Each structure stands twice: as C-alpha cells, then as structure tokens.
Amino acid sequence: MRLYINEIKIKDDTLYCYTEDTIKGLSEVGQMLVDSDNYAFAYTLDDGKAYAYLIFVQETWTMLHENMTKKIIINDELELTEFHQELTYILDNIKGNNNYGKEFVATVEETFDIE
C-alpha cells in the first residue's frame, strides 16, 4: 500500500506529515527506498503482515531538506525515529550515481544542495 504524504506542517522542532490513509497498526521498518521513475522517496512501514510505503513526492523534498533536524510525526501519531538517518544514507548513495537516471540525480542534488 502506498500512503502519500499530502500535507506537511512545521511546529517548533517537529515536522507533522499527513496522509489521507490511516496508519493504525503500522510501525517503521527503518528503510528508505527510491522511486526514481516517479521522483519519490518511499519510507517503509510494517503492520506485521505486509509492508506499506509512505511516499514523499518531489514537492515535499524542499520541506524535508530545510527541516532535516526536526522530528517527523505522521498523522499526529507515529514518530519516524530513523527517517533522517535513512534519508541521509539514500542521499549519499544518489550523489553522482546515474543508475537512478541523470535527471532524477540532478533534481535530488539541486533540491538537497548536494555537491
């Protein structure tokens, strides 16, 4: 199941991210995937039976980049404690790696100020 983040609010030291779908029973796996075809990052969640993916589309990337030190809470109930570590790992892997596609890599490098 793909759960799209469609709203992000900032309050104090927290990034509140919202999806229209319920996340009840889901916990974080601590793994970030890349969907380079659709310009998105997918953060893996698990309910014990199947995986779900929180989808952060390109339009959310600037907010993520500008708030890399803030906590991330989904639908006011699930804190993603490993999100920033996973995102940093993925960004390090994408840097200069055209296996993801030149345009995707260029967009990520520009948005996240990767040199």
UniProtKB/Swiss-Prot annotation:
This is UPF0738 protein SAB0871. Belongs to the UPF0738 family. It comes from the Bacteria.
